[in-house]
Design a protein with these regions (language model features):
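Beta-rich accessory regions
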Residues: 1-201
Length: 201
């Protein structure tokens, strides 16, 4: 996939590029004939320092902070049981003062995966909301895989949808928070890994 550089045109000319490749993906046809996608398995070799938190409730309207889970190079795997809730999501790159954060959510009523960059950066980039069609099946858990590479954030939802953006945080925040909408959610598991560099130099 291609991730566009959302900085002003003058900066694109100065730095000499207008975007970058996203993570390599495996693509295949599902049993229903629709496209499936996930990050290639080889990326798992970059994982370091696994952390796990399992089986807890996030109340509607809460922002549940995952202390110690954040890092500037990060992979998250989040499995959520929605129950009667209408949405659930995660915020990454959260600054301590909450002025910067990038929000990723599933909206069951709108049947969308939503990437909200409205508070991603105090400085650069498009402060807008990007969405993609996505719907959970009956009784299906929400599985989000989120990758943070400093200013690049990519999310994969249940192997069926993905969004990637440059977000340009300026405050150095690495906080991670979960949230629920329209009801409480049960988080079956959150796994987090710090990621090492893919190049040895």
């Amino acid at each position: 996939s291609w991730i566009f550089d959302d900085r002003p045109d003058s900066l694109k000319k100065f730095y000499g590029w207008t975007g970058m490749y996203g993570l390599p993906r495996s693509l295949w046809a599902g049993a229903d004939g629709t496209l499936r996608m996930r990050p290639v398995k080889e990326l798992e070799t970059l994982r370091r320092k696994e952390q796990v938190k399992s089986n807890f409730i996030v109340k509607e309207g809460w922002e549940f902070k995952l202390n110690g889970f954040g890092h500037e190079l990060l992979e998250l795997e989040i499995t959520v049981q929605l129950g009667k809730a209408t949405g659930a999501g995660v915020m990454v790159d959260c600054s301590d003062d909450q002025r910067e954060q990038t929000s990723i959510a599933y909206d069951a009523s709108e049947k969308q995966l939503i990437f909200d960059a409205g508070k991603s950066s105090l400085d650069l980039g498009r402060r807008n909301i990007e969405s993609a069609p996505f719907e959970l099946k009956k009784d299906e858990n929400l599985i989000l895989r989120v990758f943070v590479d400093k200013g690049i954030v990519e999310v994969f939802a249940n192997d069926r949808q993905a969004i990637g953006r440059c977000v340009y945080p300026r405050l150095g925040g690495t906080g991670v928070k979960l949230f629920a909408k329209g009801g409480d959610i049960r988080v079956l598991s959150v796994k987090a890994w710090e990621l090492t560099a893919s190049n040895p130099y």
